[in-house]
């Protein structure tokens, strides 16, 4: 298999389906006449009929990650898949081990403690250390040894189902073996000597990136645009060098030149910080005092550097980023299409080039057994087949079949079950009919919103009186207790009018039901037994629940279509942004480890040099690099650009070396100028793309045509992964077309 060849069977989907289908007995029917029933997907792949094999492959194709294609074509396929699914059943252990590796960075004792003084880290107040406990050297070695053993098992387990030849062709596997060897050597060196530097903290983060597929794809995408980024950085450097030289020459004989721009190196540094606007306008105050016209120089510099050059860098980088990202998506789509083509060929035994209605329904019936989606009715099978059959000829071609993963992700809206009260005659009386109509009306909704507003006012007043220790607080507590009865009545009326099944189908109603009963029971017990139950007599926890109830006011915003789109976009964006936020976290971990090894232990009470720094005068001593938790918080402050030059200049003074500037400047260039700007640009484009998708679905639902009616029946509730996939394809449609045509 060539290096570019991608794995075919998805690990994540296999794990998910295994968990959902392996614990229940499969129902009869479907999958062809007289088909055997298999409890696990591995059994179906090895021994099942063509529908069961195809269903397993379709389910595995959803996430696009898995074992190499060679294994699918191997004569020992059944045995290989048995080992593969054993490996997947241990996924919880592999995930827990990766988490343990990252956690070790926070718990191991900093190296400077072992180097400078044996008990230095016990003096937490002196060194401004965090509150997490530290492992001793013996404890760290035991912990690292256990994680190393599990890591070896995880990396070498694929040999059981891939074989040595296929395993060793993968660059990823080779890199893992190399890193594993370096990690083992680092642990051995650490066990027998005390070195001021270790590679283990960095390797742990690399393993995190290589283990999580989304992080790995994100890292590959970012690596692909390094060349473009270096080109625009060179342009920015030329601009900075020229502007610094111009500033140094212009203000040479002025107080600005004598106090701030004393040399070209200092001028270059100050102009770089001004490029980030962190020292604006402090850096040019001396020049401004001499002549107000000098401000034009700095204003033009900031406008060109911040609002033109920085945005130009962002535009070039984001364009390259989309191109690299599109290549990744094209590869994922090709993997999925390849697997679905194999599933199609398994069913199309007569090589007709299409699947008929009965074949598709048999496949969907088998998918019911393997997928984690709710069991689908026969009527829904017809709708899915209609979605696939875009040509309307009652035949699903291989091209139409390629959209199966997106189509089966649709969750069809079910008819609510009838109320249990339907069998009683009084439920159909005119009085009950008017009551049910009233509960379903807008008027009833407005009344509840009005009560919620009163509840909000009551909570604010009661909380204020509690802070002031006023005796009037009890009156407002009684008001809140009375309002609680209104919510119970609201819940009862809705269940009576809609039926519990229809009531429980709405997520908002589930939230209201749990919250209402929790608050009502808590308030009742508090009023009934105010002194016998100490926990309940403390009304603080009920107050927080009352504030949670007020969150129901968000339903007012959801009545507005634009706000509803905002909420939907927010949740979709959070899912799509997680890999990039994860990469930012990994960068922070890398720089935190480096910061501990470079700057660890130099910030401590009694250091005479420390008292001369801005770190001391601004009371930023707790934000240091003396231990891992403190370092992560410090880097977060640098990430948000909050007086970041204070740390840069203070550590310059503390170390006495200008080389320390490289640490902070490189962090700015990688984390802020590159990653955060990419995230901002990604959020902007993703927001507009999601708005277009939401508006398009709104038009489809409101369409009076038969297609609109059909869309109305199929409530498109997709998994987060599917929603993100659709959003990314919509965002990068132009780039994807270009990649596929090239």
UniProtKB/Swiss-Prot annotation:
Keyword Chloroplast among record annotations: no
Gene3D superfamilies registered for this protein in UniProt: 1.10.287.70, EF-hand (1.10.238.10), Voltage-gated potassium channels. Chain C (1.20.120.350)
Subcellular location: Membrane
Activity regulation description: Inhibited by Al(3+).
Molecular function terms from GO: calcium ion binding; voltage-gated calcium channel activity
Keywords, sorted A to Z: Calcium, Calcium channel, Calcium transport, Glycoprotein, Ion channel, Ion transport, Membrane, Plant defense, Repeat, Transmembrane, Transmembrane helix, Transport, Voltage-gated channel
SUPFAM superfamilies listed in its UniProt record: EF-hand (SSF47473), Voltage-gated potassium channels (SSF81324)
Matches recorded under InterPro entries: EF-hand-dom_pair, EF_hand_dom, Ion_trans_dom, TPC1_plant, Volt_channel_dom_sf
One Pfam family recorded for the sequence: EF-hand_7
Cytoplasmic face residues: 1-82, 162-176, 318-446, 502-510, 559-582, 685-742
Domain EF-hand: 335-370, 376-411
CDD domains: EFh
Glycosylation (residues): 469
SMART domains: EFh
Glycoprotein among keywords: yes
Membrane topology recorded in Swiss-Prot or TrEMBL: Multi-pass membrane protein
Intramembrane segments: 259-273, 628-642
Recorded domain comment: Each of the two internal repeats contains five hydrophobic transmembrane segments (S1, S2, S3, S5, S6) and one positively charged transmembrane segment (S4). S4 segments probably represent the voltage-sensor and are characterized by a series of positively charged amino acids.
Binding partners and assembly: Homodimer.
Record's function text: Functions as a voltage-gated inward-rectifying Ca(2+) channel (VDCC) across the plasma membrane that mediates sucrose-induced Ca(2+) influx in autotrophically grown leaf cells. Acts as the major ROS-responsive Ca(2+) channel and is the possible target of Al-dependent inhibition. Plays a regulatory role in defense responses.
Name of the featured protein: Two pore calcium channel protein 1
Organism whose genome encodes this protein: Hordeum vulgare
